[in-house]
Amino acid sequence: MESLASLYKNHIATLQERTRDALARFKLDALLIHSGELFNVFLDDHPYPFKVNPQFKAWVPVTQVPNCWLLVDGVNKPKLWFYLPVDYWHNVEPLPTSFWTEDVEVIALPKADGIGSLLPAARGNIGYIGLVQERALQLGIEASNINPKGVIDYLHYYRSFKTEYELACMREAQKMAVNGHRAAEEAFRSGMSEFDINIAYLTATGHRDTDVPYSNIVALNEHAAVLHYTKLDHQAPEEMRSFLLDAGAEYNGYAADLTRTWSAKSDNDYAQLVKDVNDEQLALIATMKAGVSYVDYHIQFHQRIAKLLRKHQIITDMSEEAMVENDLTGPFMPHGIGHPLGLQVHDVAGFMQDDSGTHLAAPAKYPYLRCTRILQPGMVLTIEPGIYFIESLLAPWREGQFSKHFNWQKIEALKPFGGIRIEDNVVIHENNVENMTRDLKLA
């Protein structure tokens, strides 16, 4: 297996090539990429947790240090000014010496406002990529060159195609997240609260709650019907019925995003439904290949949902085709089948059809689908179908011509379990699909 250092060297070569092409297309000399800055809580003297600019961590695995700068031109070795203040109030990260530092020129930046004297004098044709636009203006960057849309669209489009270095990092993130899921299931089985299950997860992954790539969804019982439930009750429920965990990890800035659902008992209808959703998810992944629209797989899973609704007699006296045609599957799976994954959990360019940023929206029937791309080798996506029992979505169906097809008694019996979601992270290759999650034996 190639070392991370050799993979990184090739990764940088790829980023340099993309940068050269972008600069030539948009007639710029270089890009100045800002890691970001700390911002204080309103009327307070402590900052919000720092989140690095994803375009910055695409180049270097520096994710916790504000006030850093990268200058890249696609030709010369990337230059990193690494913030290294004299500070006895806060932790100061040492100047990095790691697998990646041979391929980047690393320079200490002792003062956050000292970058101006270190940059090239002629800056009118440098593009700035970052959050703090006023800082770019102070440095003499032209307003039209601050986050230039064409450049960002171009870079975002090609971020869809992961380098071997990026895939190696994402496989490591998978390992961390899988460890967390196993620890969380054990905590659930022992009767812990959502709050304590979350602590078990973070401990197993080696993350703080500000390190995970998104807020963990730790949902017991009916809380599993809230798609992005992040409350974390401190008290365990009197009766444990179900547990939905949607939680990831991050390695060198790259995310994992996994979901599993467990039934407290193995011999009820809900447990069988969990198994069936899992089986259908795996069956869908087995059909995936390059050259097919991601939208097609979303639509196909609605057909699989219809099959399960009929099997479990949740919808009765209606064909599977009619269920999908009339959107009776919609209230049971109101989100998309998944999304691109990478430096960001909901990674960029899900709707871009080319490197000019041409946008193809989700189908009107499925507005929450986050990707309309044709699958190509190098893409990484989540596949995360679900079935939920959400009253606000079911309520409109309680009246009207289709109400009689809903088995309301069965639905009421399943509502206390909340819902089900099963999520794996897959890589599209030329001749196969790699399931990074199942390769680690996470059931």
Swiss-Prot record:
HAMAP family cross-referenced by the UniProt entry: X_Pro_dipeptid
UniProt entry keywords in alphabetical sequence: Dipeptidase, Hydrolase, Manganese, Metal-binding, Metalloprotease, Protease
Requisite cofactors: Mn(2+)
PROSITE patterns associated with the record: PROLINE_PEPTIDASE (PS00491)
Cofactor, how bound (note): Binds 2 manganese ions per subunit.
A family per Pfam: PepQ_N
GO annotation terms (biological process): proteolysis
Name of this protein: Xaa-Pro dipeptidase
Record-level Gene Ontology MF annotations: aminopeptidase activity; metal ion binding; metalloexopeptidase activity; phosphoric triester hydrolase activity; proline dipeptidase activity
The reaction(s) this protein catalyses: Xaa-L-Pro dipeptide + H2O = an L-alpha-amino acid + L-proline
InterPro entries named in the record: Creatin/AminoP/Spt16_N (IPR029149), Creatinase/aminopeptidase-like (IPR036005), PepQ_N (IPR048819), Pept_M24 (IPR000994), Peptidase_M24B_aminopep-P_CS (IPR001131), X-Pro_dipept-like (IPR052433), X_Pro_dipept (IPR022846)
Source organism of the structure: Shigella flexneri serotype 5b (strain 8401)
Coiled coil, from the record: none
SUPFAM superfamilies: Creatinase/aminopeptidase
Entry EC number(s): 3.4.13.9
Keyword Metal-binding: yes
